[in-house]
């Protein structure tokens, strides 16, 4: 006999008191901490518990009794469905206040180290249309909104291009307007969608692995250049013809596109790192500019997605490094060498290390394009490349700049940094929690001298943080 499912409680007239991880807010009911999406501190709501553990629960708001005085009206029609921009219900001034608190709480609670006064967070000048890259997914499993489901109508058009629905990997929400990228992105996506509808193109099915149209990537830059990459599954010659007809339509409709590319992808996933990118029209790259430096960006290249704030972030890192032109700098997790090249004019020599070989090739190209001859780049796993032997061979760094992934630095990397004993360490992080853990491991030899949070992603809970450490006397 099947076990009867336990009925979860309805919590009435609960006041939301704070923000929490992953863009959620929280309330406390007796000793129970309740995490709730799409509410803000000050809201008074009825909460339907969806999942309950001993000391915490997850719930959704089913009724609002009072709206918080700081609540903002979300500006996007897709808010609350697509899974992005979860903090649109908070004014931007409140968002950055909570991001500042997130950095402070993590450094104190996890790091448990002596801290200077944390500098005020550096907010983003642009809070809409700030991204330079978006990817959209094609699917024949369009997500139906609650209103559409209630109408109990059989819809003829179930193809969609947009964003994956959280928790429903094969469903895609049809996006009409996204506020993250310049509006040309919306125009291109919608034009491709309409053309595909009109000409009966097949959209990909993630479960059956059938269908032609798979993915669309659009990149913009401050130089005005524009890249569009269409990813398709091609099993018949006729489908290749259909794809090229679509690309020809895009080229004619949007002559401002400077790089029109395509990828044939017959794999089970959408990653293109191991696939050949073909040029349909224009160049295979676009450029981004920063302080007179030009950075070449291909379809596979990594570049910070908020160009304006990336510049501010890099300036903070460079200022913290305190370069005089005499220093040997190690740039760890260098990516395409953006920071390495950005600080090279103020350093004697910069050595960049990165896991992805293609990114290192981009870094070398970017040095060459800008006439920079004092950089060296190495590809490989950081813990395997950055060793005591490597340091003995290349020299002890005066400054280390490190910008690791969200997981932070491997223990072996931290131990090698401690062996290298640079005078200063500049730690750039996209995850203050793992940064705090790493800082505690460096604390015996290094003191935190400055902390600068930077908001790269308005309307999300994500925050970057830059920390300067100096060797203890």
Listing of model-derived features with the role each one plays in the protein:
Residues 218, 224-233, 294-298:
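Short, aliphatic-rich beta-strand segments
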Residues 63-74, 80-202:
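Extended interfacial segments that mediate partner engagement and assembly in macromolecular machines
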Residues 25-30, 162-165, 229-231, 363:
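Short, acidic/hydrophobic/Gly-rich beta-strand patch recurrent on exposed beta strands
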Residues 2-13, 18-23, 237-473:
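Rossmann-like S-adenosyl-L-methionine
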Residues 170-206, 210-214, 234-261:
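Internal alpha/beta scaffold segment
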Residues 1-78, 376, 383-384:
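Terminal RNA-binding accessory module
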Residues 119-126, 206, 213-215, 453-456:
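Short, solvent-exposed loop/turn elements at beta->coil junctions and helix N-caps
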């Amino acid at each position: 006999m099947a076990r009867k499912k336990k009925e979860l409680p309805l919590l009435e007239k609960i006041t939301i008191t704070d923000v929490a991880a992953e863009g959620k807010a929280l309330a406390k009911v007796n000793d129970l901490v309740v995490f709730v999406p799409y509410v803000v501190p000050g809201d008074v709501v009825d909460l339907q518990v969806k999942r309950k553990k001993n000391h915490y629960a997850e719930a959704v708001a089913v009724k609002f009794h009072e709206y918080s005085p700081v609540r903002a009206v979300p500006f996007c029609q897709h808010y609350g469905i697509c899974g992005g921009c979860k903090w649109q219900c908070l004014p931007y001034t409140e968002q950055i206040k909570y991001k500042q608190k997130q950095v402070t709480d993590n450094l104190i609670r996890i790091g448990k180290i002596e801290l200077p006064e944390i500098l005020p967070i550096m907010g983003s000048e642009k809070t809409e249309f700030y991204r330079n890259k978006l990817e959209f997914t094609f699917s024949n499993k369009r997500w139906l909104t609650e209103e559409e489901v209630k109408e109990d109508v059989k819809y003829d058009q179930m193809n969609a291009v947009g964003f994956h629905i959280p928790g429903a990997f094969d469903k895609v929400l049809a996006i009409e307007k996204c506020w993250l990228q310049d509006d040309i992105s919306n125009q291109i996506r919608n034009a491709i969608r309409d053309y595909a509808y009109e000409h009966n193109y097949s959209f990909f099915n993630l479960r059956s692995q059938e269908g032609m149209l798979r993915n669309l990537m659009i990149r913009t830059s401050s130089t005005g250049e524009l890249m569009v990459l269409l990813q398709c599954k091609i099993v018949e010659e006729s489908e290749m013809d259909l794809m090229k007809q679509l690309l020809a339509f895009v080229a004619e409709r949007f002559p401002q596109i400077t790089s029109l590319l395509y990828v044939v992808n017959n794999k089970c996933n959408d990653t293109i790192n191991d696939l050949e990118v073909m040029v349909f029209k224009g160049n295979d790259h676009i450029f981004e500019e920063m302080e007179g430096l030009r950075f070449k960006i291909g379809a596979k290249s990594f570049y910070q997605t908020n160009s304006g704030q990336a510049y501010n972030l890099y300036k903070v890192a460079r200022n913290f490094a305190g370069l005089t032109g005499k220093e040997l700098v190690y740039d760890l997790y260098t990516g395409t060498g953006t920071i390495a090249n950005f600080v090279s004019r103020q350093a004697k020599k910069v050595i960049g290390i990165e896991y992805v070989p293609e990114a290192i090739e981009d870094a070398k190209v970017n040095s060459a394009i800008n006439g920079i001859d004092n950089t060296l780049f190495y590809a490989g796993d950081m813990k395997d490349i950055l060793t005591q032997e490597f340091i003995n061979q290349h020299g002890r760094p005066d400054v280390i700049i490190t910008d690791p992934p969200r997981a932070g630095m491997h223990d072996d990397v931290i131990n090698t940094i401690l062996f290298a004993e640079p005078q200063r360490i500049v730690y750039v992080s996209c995850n203050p929690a793992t940064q705090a853990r790493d800082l505690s491991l460096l604390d015996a030899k290094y003191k935190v001298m400055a902390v600068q949070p930077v908001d790269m992603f308005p309307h999300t809970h994500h925050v970057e943080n830059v920390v300067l450490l100096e060797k203890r006397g």
